[in-house]
Structure formats: structure tokens, C-alpha cells
Amino acid sequence: MKNYSNSIGLDISKKYFDAVLFVSGEHERFPNEKKGFTSFIRWLKRHGYGPANVLICFENTGYYSLQLSFFLSEKEFDYVQEHACR
């Protein structure tokens, strides 16, 4: 079992996704497209987080979260998608 130093919460919509660092409460908004995904990873790295020490959590929003899921997997980030009805 991994021991993560922080968790990131995402709120994903059609055009944007919002990210919050749980430890500091810092917030940032990114476009929900590949350019935004890349900016999100740079933002994480500026805060000292990478695939080895952060867990990303978000609600499964179907198509809106699908491309981000693929991107995070490709970059070897751990993430949890929660079903909206739970």
C-alpha cells in the first residue's frame, strides 16, 4: 500500500476542471483538454507532487472525466473515480 503525502480533489465539468490541494487548500482551474491536463501536472510539480506521492480523487462524470483519466494513467498518476450516486 502506498503512503501518499497529499490528496488532490477535482471537480470536472465540460469546459474546466477545478483542483484543490487538501493539505493547503490551494485551488486552481484548468481547461478540460490536453493543454489543461499538462498545466495541471506542472502545477502539481511546482507544489512538489508527482506520481509517487499524490492521490487524485474525482467524481466519474462520464465523457467529461474520460480523457483526463487516460492522461493520468499515461503519466502513471494514481487516481480514484467515485460514482456520483455513492
Language model feature labels by segment:
Residues 1-86:
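Phosphate- and other anionic-substrate recognition elements at nucleic-acid/protein interfaces
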